[in-house]
Swiss-Prot record:
Keyword Metal-binding in annotation: yes
Stored PROSITE patterns: FERRITIN_2, FERRITIN_LIKE
Any one GO MF annotation of this record: ferrous iron binding
GO BP annotations, alphabetical order: intracellular iron ion homeostasis; iron ion transport
The protein's name in its UniProt record: Ferritin light chain, oocyte isoform
GO CC, any one term: cytoplasm
Annotated binding of Fe cation, by residue: 26, 64, 106
Annotated function: Stores iron in a soluble, non-toxic, readily available form. Important for iron homeostasis. Iron is taken up in the ferrous form and deposited as ferric hydroxides after oxidation.
Limits of the Ferritin-like diiron domain: 9-158
InterPro entries: Ferritin, Ferritin-like, Ferritin-like_diiron, Ferritin-like_SF, Ferritin_CS, Ferritin_DPS_dom
Protein family according to the UniProt entry: Belongs to the ferritin family.
Species per Swiss-Prot/TrEMBL record: Xenopus laevis (African clawed frog)
CDD domains: Euk_Ferritin
Length: 177
């Protein structure tokens, strides 16, 4: 076990564990989005904008994980990496299914960040509260809204049933992101 950090101040062990947990969730999300992104890049799927959308999301999630790990070190916590679980699927079906998976995943990440915010509140850690509010919660809410909007539009054009709707969504909606 490593020695206690000399810079650690008002940083509870529960907060430290929560930061490591969320970093792992972000890495798992990154891994899943990478899988989805390259699924849509396959020659038999060929939806390039879906591919780009999910690969960019993968990169953002990896960046978030690194931000949490930097925060951990800045506060005098210890980074403890966990195994990154392989996604349950390798075949993502269609854009509607992929957006549903992404929306559910982002809602669970948002809940984990909210839970960590509560821990910070319970332990009177205004620095962590501010960090979570300004660096993550607003961005998560915006992403959840964007995914929800995409899902609504995919359902509207019956993308899961008709290939043309999914193709047009790929070209016209995701093409503008």
């Amino acid at each position: 076990m490593s020695a206690q950090s000399q810079i650690r101040q008002n940083y509870h062990e529960e907060s430290e564990a929560g930061v490591n947990r969320i970093a792992n969730l972000e890495l798992q999300a990154s891994y899943l989005y990478l899988s989805v992104g390259y699924y849509f890049d396959r020659d038999d799927v060929a939806l390039s904008k879906f591919s780009k959308f999910f690969r960019e999301l993968s990169e953002k999630k990896r960046d978030h994980a690194e931000d949490f790990l930097k925060f951990q070190n800045k506060r005098g916590g210890r980074v403890v990496l966990q195994d990154v679980k392989k996604p349950d699927d390798d075949e993502w079906g269609n854009g509607t299914k992929a957006m549903e998976v992404a929306l559910n995943l982002e809602k669970s990440i948002n809940q984990a960040v909210l839970d960590l915010h509560k821990i910070a509140t319970d332990h009177t850690d205004p620095h962590m509260q501010d960090y979570l509010e300004h660096e993550f919660l607003e961005e998560e809410v915006k992403l959840i809204k964007k995914l929800g909007d995409h899902l609504t539009n995919l359902r509207r054009v019956k993308a899961a049933e008709e290939g043309m709707g999914e193709y047009l969504f790929d070209k016209l909606t995701l093409g503008e992101d």
